[in-house]
Amino acid sequence: MKLSLDWMNDFTPLKEVGLDAILKKIAISVCEIDDATEFRPELDFVKIVRIESLEKHPSADKLQIAQVFDGSSKSQIVTGVTNVKIGDLVPLAIPGAKLGDKEILESELRGVKSSGMLCSEKELFLSEEGNGVWILNGLDQAEVGKTIRSFLYYNDIIFEVDNKSITHRPDLWSHFGFARELASQLRLPIVFNPFESLWNFDLSVKLPKVLENQNAHSYYASSISGVSVFPSKRKFQSRLQKCGVRVINNVVDVSNYVMLEMGQPTHFFDKKFLENQGGISLEVSFAKKGESFALLDETSPALEEEVLLIRNQGKPVAIAGVMGGKESAVQNTTTEIVMESAVFMRERIRKSIRSTGIRSDSSVRYEKGLEATTTLPVIRRALNLLKENGCSELKASEPVGFLHIPHKEVRIHTDIHFINAKLGVTLSQGDITDILERLHFIVSWKGEHLEVLVPKFRHNYDVTIPEDLVEEIGRTKGYDTIQVSPLLAEVKTPIRNLNRELERKCKTFFAIALKYHEVFNYSFQSYKENEFSGDPKLSVKIKNEMPEEQSVLRNSLLPSLLKNTRTNQDRFSEIKIFEFGRVYFNLPEPENEKKIFAFAVSLDKKSSEPDLKLLEEDFLKIKKEVESFLESIQIYEYTWKIQQETIFHPGANLCLVARSGKDGLETIVGNLGYVHPAILDSFELKKRVIYGSFEFERIVELWNQNRKVSRFVTPSQFPEAEIDLSILVGEKENTNVFTDLVKLERIPELKEGWVYSQFMGGNVPEGKKSVSYRFRLVNYERTFTQERIKEISDQLVILAGKNGFVLR
């Protein structure tokens, strides 16, 4: 965005401050400035001169020798133009002037000295066309000796503001708004406020009709007569050109001028065109799909239903806040107009921009969110500018329209301690009041608490919470004035999050020690998948429209892990995965949600594998891994029990039982087993899958009970010993039965025992299996003797015999 320093000086005496001070304050307290440059400084070397005499060139028929006067001295110019005469006022580029890539030098043309060049508007880059020298006779303030830059009101500095740095400040998207901000920051007075302009409306002018609805915050229209259309006065043209806006005529230029000055767009309709549509009845409404009409940019886009329009008698005449229609625009013959001043909802303007692809200066301002009560002051200011710009016989009707929420107020409550703590400084009540009142806030104190009434031009989306006030005070005081101080932090013992801590331990052990891979899945699955793992009636249905396969929240991690296994079954011979996730139930809190740690293992055994020995070995291997995991988190006291669950194969599932809580009651902590073949088939799995899960909160409870108990035992300095024992057990009998019996014997040297192999067939009786156990012996006092090892071995043999087990 471009801003004119000369224009802003109309509202506050910025030129008294100095450019460096202004730029510094803008950079520190307002926004980013990309550039600040003199506008067309090369025109300082082009002066208005009067032609004193004209003579033919002695050596060239097409050249003339002109003597010109610049108010202080005469110069001789050789020129080839034919449209000048004695007494004409014309622009002269003196030696040293640079016009584009051309530098003007003193020269001789056919032996005659020439001290400059008489210029056309095209040569001065003021017009695309130029027939001969620019004749300035009779033009207002065309005085001999004046520079063309001064004559055109080009003596100015243009600020180029980085738009993204003020996108949250719609009040700064205008010359007055920016000047008001600088006046506050630099402690300057406001000498002219365009929002306070007055106008006497004429009751004799017929009122337009405006239909009220909720499609705009505010919408007013005024009927205006006595309009004459011709080029704008030089001041208006100059200010628009300096801001990069194309000059059109004295009516349209005022609309653009008001937008750049006050920040609120307006639009002028040709009144006769509206009347020819059946009368003037303006309404803000939405487009019909595919509707189209010609716009000012010569396009006729097919509109979507989300585009907001201005209609007259139901016919579209403008895209609201974006661009007017071509047919209803002001023409050279226009004598009566209807002025629109409105504030639209920023969300609707954004949708119109997105749908049409049209981004105009008006829409850029509307999409920021303008203050709705400015519509009437803008009309009064525009009428004054129309009169100033040549429409001296102007008459206007009282504006007709509507304003929703005219008395909106935003009050913020905070206290001095909050402000000082946030800024890291110590400000007094007087300091805070001074800064906020300079920024047009109204402040009232009650002890150390303050109430702040936000000015209307800031209260829409900009300043709404106490932190916004802190920012206003900080930027105005200057962040560079806040002293740097080292950060101080109290050294405290960190609060331990046991759940998070144990979760990391579990993940680390499974991923590193056991070589599992962690997976992440969505919590959505189908109602049918919930039937596998519990009562589907307890399923939590998702309210959003979702496909059937993602219509409920999961009640088990099993379906997710089986789908992961299916995806990878043809890629890897061995799959070991785990997941931490939540499951959900349609139950009262806290039973409605549980955290589960689950894993799935596929070890290349087909779902139809007949060799039960191989299957049991795999199962025991995974069971051993689970036990090593439990040992790693200091859970030692537990038992495995057979418990039938529908998700598991009837002959291959266990539940993990442990005592927890103060009452020491046995609780099921987890389960382990081969997934039921029917479930494997429904997931199109070709291989056997072992699935295990833990209710995480139960594991946390057990770990928390045991983690403070030191179970460290000094390693024995004497060699360990092992005893192997093979017995016959029933084909379907649990192999844990014998190890549990051994534990009850409480043999001092017995450290642990486990199954290390199984065998069926051969010379093993039918219905039986041979199970080999290995027992580890540790003595902390002496080296094992053969006699002691034999005693323990005999004790185990006797134990087996007493309980009906046959030795192998």
From Swiss-Prot:
Which residues does the UniProt record annotate as the domain B5? 407-484
**Sequence ranges assigned to domain tRNA-binding in this UniProt record:** 40-149
For this record, an example GO cellular component is: phenylalanine-tRNA ligase complex
Q: Pfam families under this entry?
A: B3_4, B5, FDX-ACB, tRNA_bind, tRNA_synthFbeta
Entry keywords, A to Z: Aminoacyl-tRNA synthetase, ATP-binding, Cytoplasm, Ligase, Magnesium, Metal-binding, Nucleotide-binding, Protein biosynthesis, RNA-binding, tRNA-binding
InterPro entries, alphabetically? aa-tRNA-synth_II/BPL/LPL (IPR045864), B3/B4_tRNA-bd (IPR005146), DNA-bd_dom_put_sf (IPR009061), Fdx_antiC-bd (IPR005121), Fdx_antiC-bd_sf (IPR036690), NA-bd_OB-fold (IPR012340), Phe-tRNA-ligase_IIc_bsu (IPR045060), Phe-tRNA-ligase_IIc_bsu_bact (IPR004532)
The compartments listed are: Cytoplasm
Q: Which GO terms describe its molecular function?
A: ATP binding; magnesium ion binding; phenylalanine-tRNA ligase activity; tRNA binding
Q: Which reaction does it catalyse?
A: tRNA(Phe) + L-phenylalanine + ATP = L-phenylalanyl-tRNA(Phe) + AMP + diphosphate + H(+)
Enzyme Commission no: 6.1.1.20
The record's free-text note on cofactor binding: Binds 2 magnesium ions per tetramer.
**Annotated binding of Mg(2+), by residue:** 462, 468, 471-472
Output the GO biological process annotations, alphabetical, semicolon-separated. phenylalanyl-tRNA aminoacylation
Which cofactor(s) are needed, names only?
Mg(2+)
What's the subunit arrangement here? Tetramer of two alpha and two beta subunits.
Q: Which family does it belong to?
A: Belongs to the phenylalanyl-tRNA synthetase beta subunit family. Type 1 subfamily.
Name assigned to this protein? Phenylalanine--tRNA ligase beta subunit
